[in-house]
């Protein structure tokens, strides 16, 4: 079951520690990280999905050679859609989408300026639209959570999914 564990303000997830600033470290981080600014853009959800699809292609997740790999890629695209949509509906829109891959997982981060706290709700009426986003995220991800932006309004909602085997 996923949790919204409290994190330190400087917790930015895997791949950010160590020798940041060194040319090799910056090059390696760029290879495993993709960043998309979303502030003031229109068509944000399809743009985020297209950006993520291209990253998955660059990283060899797509085109999928097996049903399991295809399902893993579809899960990533669905979670990106849900997190970005949630930021649009409840936080004034997303500012940035960050994708970080490791050999075992993919971490998605959506930064927004909102003060609310996302929480999964058990769908009361499974056949009706709306209110299912964080429930879907909780079901598909290894873990997810929220990192607050210190004294300022805003947060980063992150989710981790298993890499395809």
Regions found by a protein language model. Give the residues of each.
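Conserved terminal C-lobe alpha helix of the protein kinase catalytic domain
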Residues: 46-49, 53, 77, 81, ...
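Short, well-structured hydrophobic secondary-structure segments
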Residues: 79, 85-89
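Conserved short strand/loop->alpha-helix "switch" segment adjacent to the catalytic nucleotide/phosphoryl-transfer site
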Residues: 56-81
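Short amphipathic alpha-helical interaction segments
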Residues: 44, 83, 128-129
């Amino acid at each position: 079951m996923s949790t919204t564990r409290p994190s330190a303000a400087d917790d930015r997830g895997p791949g950010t520690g160590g020798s940041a600033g060194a040319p090799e470290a910056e090059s390696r981080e760029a290879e495993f990280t993709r960043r998309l600014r979303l502030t003031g853009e229109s068509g944000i959800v399809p743009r985020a999905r297209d950006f993520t699809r291209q990253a998955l292609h660059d990283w060899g997740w797509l085109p999928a050679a097996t049903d399991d790999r295809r399902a893993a890629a579809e899960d990533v695209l669905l979670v990106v859609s849900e997190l970005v949509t949630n930021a649009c509906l409840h936080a004034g829109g997303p500012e940035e989408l960050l994708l970080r891959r490791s050999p075992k997982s993919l971490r998605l981060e959506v930064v927004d300026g909102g003060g609310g706290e996302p929480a999964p709700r058990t769908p009361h009426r499974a056949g009706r639209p709306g209110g299912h986003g964080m429930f879907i995220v909780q079901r598909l991800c290894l873990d997810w959570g929220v990192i607050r932006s210190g004294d300022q309004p805003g947060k980063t909602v992150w989710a981790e999914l298993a890499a395809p085997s």
